[in-house]
Protein backbone atom coordinates (compact mmCIF):
# COMPACT_ATOMS: atom_id res chain seq x y z
CA UNK A 1 0.00 0.00 0.00
CA UNK A 2 1.56 3.28 -1.11
CA UNK A 3 -1.07 5.37 0.69
CA UNK A 4 -2.31 8.66 -0.73
CA UNK A 5 -0.29 10.05 -3.63
CA UNK A 6 -1.74 13.55 -3.26
CA UNK A 7 1.13 15.04 -1.22
CA UNK A 8 3.73 13.59 -3.58
CA UNK A 9 2.03 14.37 -6.87
CA UNK A 10 4.18 17.33 -7.90
CA UNK A 11 7.46 15.63 -7.02
CA UNK A 12 6.31 12.40 -8.66
CA UNK A 13 5.50 14.26 -11.87
CA UNK A 14 9.02 15.67 -11.95
CA UNK A 15 10.59 12.28 -11.20
CA UNK A 16 8.58 10.49 -13.89
CA UNK A 17 9.33 13.20 -16.46
CA UNK A 18 13.02 12.80 -15.66
CA UNK A 19 12.73 9.03 -16.05
CA UNK A 20 11.04 9.51 -19.41
CA UNK A 21 13.65 11.92 -20.83
CA UNK A 22 16.56 12.75 -18.55
CA UNK A 23 18.30 14.73 -21.31
CA UNK A 24 15.67 17.48 -21.01
CA UNK A 25 16.95 18.26 -17.52
CA UNK A 26 20.10 19.99 -16.39
CA UNK A 27 21.29 22.05 -13.45
CA UNK A 28 20.00 25.30 -14.97
CA UNK A 29 16.44 24.23 -15.79
CA UNK A 30 15.46 21.73 -13.10
CA UNK A 31 13.85 24.40 -10.90
CA UNK A 32 11.72 25.61 -13.79
CA UNK A 33 10.15 22.22 -14.49
CA UNK A 34 7.60 22.34 -11.67
CA UNK A 35 6.91 26.01 -12.30
CA UNK A 36 6.29 25.29 -16.00
CA UNK A 37 3.88 22.50 -15.03
CA UNK A 38 2.03 24.70 -12.54
CA UNK A 39 1.84 27.59 -15.01
CA UNK A 40 0.43 25.22 -17.64
CA UNK A 41 -2.47 24.61 -15.26
CA UNK A 42 -2.98 28.01 -13.61
CA UNK A 43 -1.89 30.48 -16.26
CA UNK A 44 1.17 32.32 -17.47
CA UNK A 45 0.21 35.49 -15.62
CA UNK A 46 1.08 33.75 -12.34
CA UNK A 47 4.52 32.55 -13.46
CA UNK A 48 6.62 35.08 -11.55
CA UNK A 49 4.64 34.67 -8.32
CA UNK A 50 4.52 30.87 -8.50
CA UNK A 51 8.25 30.74 -9.23
CA UNK A 52 8.99 32.99 -6.25
CA UNK A 53 6.74 30.99 -3.93
CA UNK A 54 8.07 27.59 -4.99
CA UNK A 55 11.74 28.61 -4.97
CA UNK A 56 11.44 30.09 -1.48
CA UNK A 57 9.38 27.12 -0.26
CA UNK A 58 12.04 24.64 -1.38
CA UNK A 59 14.89 26.83 -0.12
CA UNK A 60 13.33 27.05 3.34
CA UNK A 61 12.50 23.35 3.29
CA UNK A 62 16.07 22.51 2.37
CA UNK A 63 17.29 24.40 5.44
CA UNK A 64 14.92 22.35 7.55
CA UNK A 65 11.81 20.42 6.62
CA UNK A 66 8.67 21.64 8.39
CA UNK A 67 7.57 18.14 9.35
CA UNK A 68 10.81 17.74 11.29
CA UNK A 69 10.71 21.07 13.13
CA UNK A 70 10.37 19.17 16.40
CA UNK A 71 13.74 17.56 15.82
CA UNK A 72 14.55 17.90 19.49
CA UNK A 73 12.06 15.27 20.62
CA UNK A 74 13.76 12.92 23.01
CA UNK A 75 12.19 9.50 22.60
CA UNK A 76 12.60 6.48 24.85
CA UNK A 77 14.26 8.26 27.70
CA UNK A 78 13.98 8.40 31.45
CA UNK A 79 11.49 11.29 31.33
CA UNK A 80 7.82 10.61 31.90
CA UNK A 81 6.99 12.55 28.74
CA UNK A 82 8.95 13.27 25.62
CA UNK A 83 10.60 16.66 25.80
CA UNK A 84 10.71 19.19 23.03
CA UNK A 85 14.07 20.88 22.64
CA UNK A 86 14.81 24.08 20.80
CA UNK A 87 15.64 24.32 17.13
CA UNK A 88 18.91 25.72 15.85
CA UNK A 89 17.17 28.90 14.69
CA UNK A 90 18.00 31.76 17.03
CA UNK A 91 15.79 34.58 18.28
CA UNK A 92 18.92 36.36 19.52
CA UNK A 93 21.45 36.04 16.72
CA UNK A 94 20.88 37.50 13.27
CA UNK A 95 17.06 37.35 13.53
CA UNK A 96 17.19 33.77 12.22
CA UNK A 97 13.86 32.63 13.65
CA UNK A 98 12.03 35.88 12.91
CA UNK A 99 13.44 35.98 9.38
CA UNK A 100 12.30 32.43 8.75
CA UNK A 101 8.79 33.22 9.99
CA UNK A 102 8.65 36.41 7.90
CA UNK A 103 9.72 34.60 4.73
CA UNK A 104 7.14 31.87 5.25
CA UNK A 105 4.49 34.53 5.90
CA UNK A 106 5.49 36.31 2.70
CA UNK A 107 5.18 33.26 0.46
CA UNK A 108 2.07 32.04 2.28
CA UNK A 109 0.38 35.40 1.70
CA UNK A 110 1.46 35.40 -1.94
CA UNK A 111 0.11 31.89 -2.54
CA UNK A 112 -3.17 32.86 -0.88
CA UNK A 113 -3.49 35.90 -3.18
CA UNK A 114 -3.01 33.65 -6.20
CA UNK A 115 -5.55 31.16 -4.83
CA UNK A 116 -8.10 33.95 -4.26
CA UNK A 117 -7.61 35.27 -7.81
CA UNK A 118 -8.06 31.90 -9.52
CA UNK A 119 -11.37 30.83 -11.03
CA UNK A 120 -13.32 28.37 -8.90
CA UNK A 121 -12.51 25.53 -11.31
CA UNK A 122 -8.76 25.85 -10.54
CA UNK A 123 -8.86 26.46 -6.79
CA UNK A 124 -8.90 22.82 -5.63
CA UNK A 125 -5.85 21.93 -7.71
CA UNK A 126 -3.92 25.01 -6.56
CA UNK A 127 -4.86 24.30 -2.95
CA UNK A 128 -3.46 20.77 -3.25
CA UNK A 129 -0.31 21.55 -5.23
CA UNK A 130 0.80 24.92 -3.86
CA UNK A 131 -1.32 26.64 -1.23
CA UNK A 132 -1.68 23.86 1.35
CA UNK A 133 1.99 22.77 1.33
CA UNK A 134 3.16 26.39 1.66
CA UNK A 135 0.54 27.39 4.25
CA UNK A 136 1.07 24.21 6.25
CA UNK A 137 4.84 24.70 6.27
CA UNK A 138 4.42 28.31 7.36
CA UNK A 139 2.09 27.38 10.21
CA UNK A 140 4.26 24.49 11.38
CA UNK A 141 7.34 26.71 11.47
CA UNK A 142 5.44 29.42 13.34
CA UNK A 143 4.04 26.90 15.81
CA UNK A 144 7.42 25.36 16.59
CA UNK A 145 9.44 28.58 16.61
CA UNK A 146 6.94 30.53 18.73
CA UNK A 147 6.82 27.55 21.13
CA UNK A 148 10.61 27.82 21.33
CA UNK A 149 10.32 31.54 22.02
CA UNK A 150 7.70 30.76 24.67
CA UNK A 151 10.05 28.36 26.47
CA UNK A 152 12.76 31.03 26.37
CA UNK A 153 10.40 33.65 27.81
CA UNK A 154 9.20 31.21 30.51
CA UNK A 155 12.79 30.64 31.66
CA UNK A 156 13.10 34.43 31.98
CA UNK A 157 9.85 34.70 33.92
CA UNK A 158 8.17 36.97 31.37
CA UNK A 159 4.42 37.49 31.49
CA UNK A 160 4.23 37.28 27.68
CA UNK A 161 4.46 33.49 27.90
CA UNK A 162 0.67 33.17 28.10
CA UNK A 163 0.27 35.28 24.97
CA UNK A 164 2.82 33.16 23.10
CA UNK A 165 1.19 29.94 24.31
CA UNK A 166 -2.13 31.19 22.88
CA UNK A 167 -0.43 31.91 19.55
CA UNK A 168 1.04 28.40 19.45
CA UNK A 169 -2.41 26.93 20.09
CA UNK A 170 -3.84 29.14 17.36
CA UNK A 171 -1.22 27.94 14.86
CA UNK A 172 -1.94 24.34 15.81
CA UNK A 173 -5.68 24.86 15.32
CA UNK A 174 -5.02 26.55 11.97
CA UNK A 175 -3.00 23.56 10.80
CA UNK A 176 -5.95 21.33 11.70
CA UNK A 177 -8.34 23.63 9.81
CA UNK A 178 -6.29 23.74 6.60
CA UNK A 179 -5.55 20.01 6.79
CA UNK A 180 -9.27 19.22 7.08
CA UNK A 181 -9.88 21.30 3.95
CA UNK A 182 -7.01 19.51 2.20
CA UNK A 183 -8.33 16.06 2.99
Annotated model-derived regions:
Residues 4-45:
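Catalytic or ion-translocation cores adjacent to nucleophile or general acid/base/metal-coordination motifs
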Residues 1:
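Globin-like tetrapyrrole-binding proteins
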Residues 32-183:
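Catalytic domains of carbohydrate-active enzymes that cleave complex glycans
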Amino acid sequence: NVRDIKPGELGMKTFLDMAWDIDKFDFDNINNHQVDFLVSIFGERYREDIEDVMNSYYHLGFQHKPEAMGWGYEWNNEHVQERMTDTDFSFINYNEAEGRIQEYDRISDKSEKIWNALPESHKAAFYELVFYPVKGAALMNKKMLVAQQNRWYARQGRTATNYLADRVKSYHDSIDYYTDKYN
